[in-house]
């Protein structure tokens, strides 16, 4: 469930369409973390529709935006004057998810909870798979048409992007590969398990890109990861 109370809404000053609004929810009474919502409006006569949701990390520092009466300018995937364009940053973050510390872009990004949690999950699964001579592989791909950008008052960009991934796991020694989470179980249903399972995910990642000349690193500030298909191979 997405929290309904709004802490801040960043409205674009751009006069044309399509346009996006970034909305930040409050922390709920049961301590659900804040969400960053991206809502799209394709034309003046259409309603805004929810495009993506990212769960903000504990203690995440978001950039500042112009006050609501002024709004903020929407950015573009090729924005210049940054340590990397939004398109480059998203592509490099996908590479970082794929290759971890061995990624050639590892030094460009600050540590974040999404990579930390994903790494722990992968290690836990690996322990079980390796004991039976099984294998696992995750492939991450940035979606060029799935990037939303809002300029911040310090000259940086807040970017929300879709990064798809496919997680293939093969159990060894005649064993069955089973879902790795309740969300995967719900999609797998009553499918007959085989030695290999393939789960496709949509990962929505929010990141801040500092202006050029800054010593700061690109910083992921929130993420949401959900499986969309889980099937036996």
Which residue ranges define each predicted feature?
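Surface-exposed, charged secondary-structure patches
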Residues: 2-35, 134-180
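Short Pro/Gly-enriched beta-strand edge/turn motifs at strand-loop
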Residues: 3-6, 129-132, 185-190
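Short beta-strand edge/turn micro-motifs at domain boundaries
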Residues: 15-21, 29-91, 154-160, 182, ...
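Core segments of small alpha/beta cavity-forming domains
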Residues: 1, 65-135
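Residue-level marker of positions within ordered structural domains that often coincide
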Residues: 98, 164, 212
């Amino acid at each position: 469930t997405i929290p309904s109370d709004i802490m801040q809404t960043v409205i674009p000053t751009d006069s044309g369409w399509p346009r996006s609004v970034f909305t930040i929810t409050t922390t709920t009474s049961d301590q659900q973390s804040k969400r960053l919502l991206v809502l799209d409006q394709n034309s003046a006569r259409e309603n805004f529709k929810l495009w993506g949701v990212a769960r903000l990390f504990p203690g995440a520092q978001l950039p500042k935006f112009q006050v609501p009466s002024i709004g903020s300018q929407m950015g573009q995937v090729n924005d210049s004057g940054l340590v990397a364009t939004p398109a480059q940053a998203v592509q490099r973050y996908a590479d970082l998810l794929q290759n971890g510390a061995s990624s050639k872009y590892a030094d460009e990004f600050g540590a974040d909870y999404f990579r930390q949690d994903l790494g722990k999950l992968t290690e836990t699964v690996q322990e079980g798979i390796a004991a039976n001579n099984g294998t696992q592989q995750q492939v991450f791909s940035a979606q060029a048409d799935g990037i939303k950008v809002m300029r911040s008052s310090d000259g940086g960009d807040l970017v929300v992007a879709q990064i798809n991934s496919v997680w293939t796991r093969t159990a060894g020694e005649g064993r069955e590969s089973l879902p790795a989470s309740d969300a995967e179980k719900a999609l797998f249903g009553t499918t007959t398990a085989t030695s290999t399972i393939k789960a496709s995910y949509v990962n929505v990642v929010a990141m801040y890109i500092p202006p050029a000349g800054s010593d700061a690193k690109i910083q992921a500030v929130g993420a949401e990861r959900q499986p969309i298909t889980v099937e036996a191979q």
